[in-house]
Amino acid sequence: MPRIIGIDIPAKKKLKISLTYIYGIGPALSEEIIARLQLNPEARAAELTEEEVGRLNALLQSDYVVEGDLRRRVQSDIKRLITIHAYRGQRHRLSLPVRGQRTKTNSRTRKGKRKTVAGKKK
């Protein structure tokens, strides 16, 4: 398993798929990185040379925000929204859907387990 920026990527998978195991790199960004470094997109991750792994590490550390840095940035953005009392921040604080989804029904994942309330007596 090649180790890229501290992450073990699967050796038997093609390079395009292996790179997506790094947080912050999806299929499109993976293709872009492979093209920039002029690597063989059909090659398996295990076939990378030490020099290619070094170039990949250098590129990811210098030009892209991935893994821990990206996670910290997302968390700080959410914290900032909460402190400035933005609507999105309040939704995050209350653990409700942030992007305008309905909450009368659905949104169970975000709200948690259903709390039963006694019905009105007739």
Swiss-Prot record:
Keyword annotations: Ribonucleoprotein, Ribosomal protein, RNA-binding, rRNA-binding, tRNA-binding
GO molecular function (one): rRNA binding
Entry keyword annotation includes Transit peptide: no
Region (Disordered): 94-122
GO biological process: one example: translation
Cellular component terms per the entry's GO annotation: cytosol; small ribosomal subunit
UniProt KW rRNA-binding keyword: yes
Ranges of compositional bias, category Basic residues: 101-122
Pfam families the UniProt entry points to: Ribosomal_S13
PROSITE patterns: RIBOSOMAL_S13_1, RIBOSOMAL_S13_2
Stated family: Belongs to the universal ribosomal protein uS13 family.
NCBIfam families in the cross-refs: uS13_bact
Record's subunit section: Part of the 30S ribosomal subunit. Forms a loose heterodimer with protein S19. Forms two bridges to the 50S subunit in the 70S ribosome.
PANTHER family named in the record: 30S RIBOSOMAL PROTEIN S13/40S RIBOSOMAL PROTEIN S18, SMALL RIBOSOMAL SUBUNIT PROTEIN US13M
Function: Located at the top of the head of the 30S subunit, it contacts several helices of the 16S rRNA. In the 70S ribosome it contacts the 23S rRNA (bridge B1a) and protein L5 of the 50S subunit (bridge B1b), connecting the 2 subunits; these bridges are implicated in subunit movement. Contacts the tRNAs in the A and P-sites.
Protein name in UniProt: Small ribosomal subunit protein uS13
